[in-house]
Swiss-Prot record:
Keywords: Chaperone, Cytoplasm, Ribosome biogenesis, rRNA processing. An accessory protein needed during the final step in the assembly of 30S ribosomal subunit, possibly for assembly of the head region. Essential for efficient processing of 16S rRNA. May be needed both before and after RbfA during the maturation of 16S rRNA. It has affinity for free ribosomal 30S subunits but not for 70S ribosomes. GO terms for molecular function: ribosome binding. This is Ribosome maturation factor RimM. It comes from Prochlorococcus marinus (strain MIT 9515). One of its GO terms (cellular component) is ribosome. The gene is rimM.
Amino acid sequence: MINHDEWLIVGLITSPQGINGKIKVKSLSDFEERFTKPGIRWIQKETESPKKLQLISGFQKPGKESFVITFKEIKNRNEAEKLKGYKLLVKVDEIPKLNKNEFHLTELMNLKVKILENNKLKIIGKVVNLENEKNNLLVIKLLTNDKEVLVPFVKEIIPEIDIKNKFLIITPPPGLLEL
């Protein structure tokens, strides 16, 4: 299990790319150098400890939020295939400092989701995933029925985020939370 106090998930390994061990990674980061600048990187499968790998190179796929990267240790497609589903991590103490009202998207994971109802804040669920291939969407698991809903990550719908106290407030338009 990933310890979110020590590690920040910055990408998801989705598939091999070609036959020479290149890997396609879905970015969860605004910092492209995490996928392009050579150096040490960490990967982890949910049930394992993080593994250290040496990033040799990487480039962004045109018009996409995904990158194709090359690790020194991964020599062929079969080895790359075994990494499908792994998460690309950075140590929390290596995260660039952000301005006051900025945060990393992955910091939204596991935040409680609140809604204003009868002038009181009510917890309705929690953030369980992020979808950002085309648009940033939060995957919220509702407490009432255990269903997951996609909520666009826009100021009009999510006017307040409190990372320190681990919650966000949503003002969904009618029907957004209904399945």
